[in-house]
Regions:
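Conserved ABC ATPase signature
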Residues: 25-29, 33
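Glycine/charge-rich catalytic "coupling/switch" loops of P-loop NTPases
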Residues: 108-109, 155-206, 223, 227-255
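Hydrophobic anchor residue at the start of the ABC signature
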Residues: 39
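A short, proline-enriched helix->beta-strand linker immediately N-terminal to the Walker B motif
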Residues: 44-48
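Catalytic Walker B motif of ABC-type/P-loop ATPase nucleotide-binding domains
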Residues: 50-54
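Conserved ABC ATPase "signature" region
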Residues: 4-21, 72-73
Length: 255
């Protein structure tokens, strides 16, 4: 009933950017446009909870990128919780506040993104481990087209993308660093093109596929993961408690 609606339809239309689609036949809409319209129809009933089961699974990467910002805005703008089911790690990292990981119908672990992903036994396929950092946008270095982001362990430099450039200084950011993009050394590297190197302490080691090792690292109050060869781990005599330097080849801004 109209009197019981908590979500104004006009606000939903504006939030999802579908005003220009309302007069078009569904058959003429792209996959991303159809998904946004479907979300609007669900929200028009003013639900107390929005259940989304693999909502982007049929979309290609471009259409996913089109829809994700709208999904990200819904809980914040409409104050409605979303139960989001997905096998896509990048979607979970982008959207989730609290994650429940299931295997064979049973809860394996749960927690916030940083707690869940920054563990040695995070449960994802070998070679796909990723660490999550919560940070803050500190500065833009216009001359170098770089932005500085601080986290509880130091600072990182990233290319100043349009998404970063549009954010105010001090805004919160979520970053991911794939374990395969982190290398280790026992001494600082001299004369390197790498922008991001941080002192760290090894907190754990485990096998991660044939001839591979996953290392858990404490960087200040934050956690990182490094995916290295078993041979490198042996040559460096890596062990828990050892001080190392983590050299980061890639950082992704996910939120």
């Amino acid at each position: 009933p109209v009197a019981r609606r908590k979500i104004a339809l006009d606000k939903v239309v504006d939030l999802l950017g579908i005003g220009h689609l309302l007069q078009r036949p569904c058959a003429t809409l792209s996959g991303g446009e159809r998904q946004r319209v479907a979300i609007a129809r669900a929200l028009a009933t003013s639900p107390q909870l929005l259940l989304m089961d693999e909502p982007l699974s049929a979309l290609d990467a471009a259409r996913k990128a089109e829809v994700l910002p709208y999904l990200e805005a819904l809980p914040r703008e409409l104050a409605i919780p979303i139960l989001y089911v997905s096998h896509a790690q990048e979607e979970v990292l982008r959207l989730a506040q609290h994650i429940v990981q299931l295997a064979h119908g049973q809860v394996v672990r749960q927690g916030d993104a940083a707690t869940l992903f920054n563990q040695l036994d995070q449960g994802f396929a070998a070679g796909n481990a990723t660490a999550v950092l919560q940070g803050q946008l500190l500065a833009h270095h216009a001359q170098d087209h770089l932005s500085a982001l601080g986290f509880a362990g130091g600072q990182l430099l990233l290319p100043t993308t349009p998404a970063l450039a549009s954010r105010p200084l001090g805004s919160a950011v979520r970053l991911t660093i794939a374990a395969r993009d982190v290398s280790l050394s026992l001494q600082p590297l001299a004369h390197t093109s790498l922008l991001n190197s941080l002192p760290a302490t090894i907190t754990g080691l485990r096998e991660d596929g044939p001839g591979q090792v996953l290392a858990a690292l404490a960087v200040g109050e934050s956690q990182l993961l490094a995916h290295i060869s078993q041979r490198s781990a042996r040559q460096l005599a890596l062990a828990p408690g050892q001080a190392v330097f983590a050299h980061i080849k890639g950082v992704a801004l996910v939120r």
